[in-house]
Regions:
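A C-terminal cap/extension of S-adenosyl-L-methionine-dependent methyltransferases
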Residues: 204-258
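A conserved beta-strand element that flanks and buttresses the S-adenosyl-L-methionine
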Residues: 115
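A short glycine-rich, Lys/Arg-flanked "PGG" loop and its adjoining helix->strand segment in the class I
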Residues: 127-142
Length: 258
């Protein structure tokens, strides 16, 4: 069977150095750092792709498992790991498989934290995946999801001057992203509800890419530190975070009641 994600993986990997992707990974990494247990905690990155989030975590001493259904993505992760020092390589494990079946694929292992960034938007219903993420966590473990913000789909086309598209997006639940794929958005309220159903307490949510999402394939400039700080501050305060392109939600699995 071929890799259904091959073309998407190619487009995603080729966009890795542009501003919007740099901001995505830097901002989610900063938000995540406020909630993760200390290294060498064990983390599983569901849909972790080429290791954009996992490899920096491994550099900090975390033991990270990437599980991804795309052989193309995992091959890219291997290439990136080959450029790292031996200690970083030893702390990253690559596994082929889907998030929904990750608990089974990983032999029932549980982890201190589970990441699922940029995956929910490709699913018709996020709740089965969120239940699967919860199953991967030990009690008290931290879950981090990154989803498309359903309440802000009109922002990008409007800021790009595509006003008819923006008008249509005001009541839409889906749009076509930069990678050319039509994907679905979630609201913060719906994600909070899905967390509760899965036995996860929501801790904090952040908006990712408030002021820069309409800039297309622009590369980072010398002002990147200022842009990062602006996006970070806006992404954790109202009303700005509510119009961000992406929602970064962090929660903790509730302890087992004795």
């Amino acid at each position: 069977m071929g890799d259904p994600f091959h073309d998407l993986a190619e487009r995603y990997n080729s966009s890795g150095e542009i501003l919007r992707q740099v901001l995505r990974h830097e901002l989610t990494g900063r938000g995540l750092a406020a909630h993760l247990p200390g290294a060498p905690a064990r983390i599983v990155d569901v849909g972790g792709g080429a290791g954009q989030q996992a490899i920096p975590l491994s550099r900090r001493g975390y033991e990270v498992t990437i599980i991804d259904p795309s052989p193309k993505m995992l091959a890219e992760a291997r290439k990136r790991l080959a450029r790292e020092e031996a200690g970083v390589r030893r702390r990253v494990r690559l596994v082929g498989g889907t998030g929904e079946r990750a608990h089974e694929t990983l032999g029932g292992e549980t982890f201190d934290s589970v990441l699922c960034h940029g995956v929910l938007m490709y699913l018709e219903d996020p709740r089965p995946m969120i239940h699967a993420l919860s199953a991967l966590l030990r009690p008290g473990g931290v879950v981090s999801v990154l989803a498309k913000n359903a309440t802000a789909l009109a922002m990008r086309p409007a800021l790009e001057g595509r006003y008819q598209d923006a008008l249509c997006s005001l009541k839409a639940e889906r749009d076509r992203g930069r990678l050319g794929v039509i994907t679905r958005g979630d609201t913060v309220e719906d994600l909070y509800g899905a967390f509760r159903e899965a036995g996860v307490e929501a801790l904090q949510w952040y908006g990712v890419r408030v002021f820069t999402d309409h800039l297309g394939d622009r590369m980072p400039g010398e002002d990147l530190p200022e842009v990062l700080e602006l996006e970070w501050e806006a992404g954790r305060s109202e009303p700005y975070r509510s119009v961000a392109r992406l929602i970064h939600l962090v929660g903790r699995k509730k302890p087992i009641q004795g």
